[in-house]
């Protein structure tokens, strides 16, 4: 039986919180800010939590992450 490996691309994008939830960054933050309002840009800077519907799939990819 082979060892399970952490999906490295996912490990770089998600961080586990103390309560076990997963933090993620927002999309649409690399360029083209002139089309976004100040409020949108400010809100995109903050991190968000992964939704419960995606949690199982992402936890499988991060199975070996501490």
Curated annotation (Swiss-Prot):
Stretches the record annotates as Disordered: 1-66
Lineage per the UniProt record: Bacteria, Bacillati, Bacillota, Bacilli, Lactobacillales
NCBIfam families attached to this UniProt entry: rpmI_bact
One Pfam family this sequence matches: Ribosomal_L35p
Entry similarity comment: Belongs to the bacterial ribosomal protein bL35 family.
Keyword Ribosomal protein belongs to the record: yes
Protein name as annotated: Large ribosomal subunit protein bL35
SUPFAM superfamilies: L35p-like
